[in-house]
């Protein structure tokens, strides 16, 4: 790592989001991973999808090896100005209504309203067929 620590704004880092110019923010540090794009085992799409945001969770979720973590040092270019990083939004799953057993009889009634007339019609056709005089 370089001794003069450069502090970069989130806006500046987020501009570098292309295959030939790719910077990532991981654990408050900025890495220029452009030279590593072709060599990344997950492909360049994985790296590109982590641009323009704090990629710490993306990086940690994969479970990188110690070797991979050591490799990061050569791509380090500075630190992120934490005040310029937008607050992360936590995902809140939509609430699903609880299963209501009272609706099950309604479903059965709807099925019966459909099937009973068909059965009556079928029975009428069978009776007519067998009682018809030749």
Swiss-Prot record:
Entry's localization field: Cell membrane; Endoplasmic reticulum membrane
Keyword Transport applies: yes
Annotated positions binding heme: 40, 64
Tissue distribution: Expressed in roots, stems, leaves, flowers and siliques.
Pfam families: Cyt-b5 (PF00173)
SUPFAM superfamilies for the chain: Cytochrome b5-like heme/steroid binding domain
GO cellular component: chloroplast thylakoid membrane; endoplasmic reticulum; endoplasmic reticulum membrane; membrane; plant-type vacuole; plasma membrane; plastid
Residue span, Cytochrome b5 heme-binding domain: 5-81
Self-association state and partner proteins as the record states: Interacts with CER1, BI-1, FAH1 and FAH2. Interacts with AKR2A.
Function: Membrane bound hemoprotein which function as an electron carrier for several membrane bound oxygenases, including fatty acid desaturases.
Name under which the protein is recorded: Cytochrome b5 isoform E
The organism of origin for this protein: Arabidopsis thaliana (Mouse-ear cress)
High-level lineage: Eukaryota, Viridiplantae, Streptophyta, Embryophyta, Tracheophyta
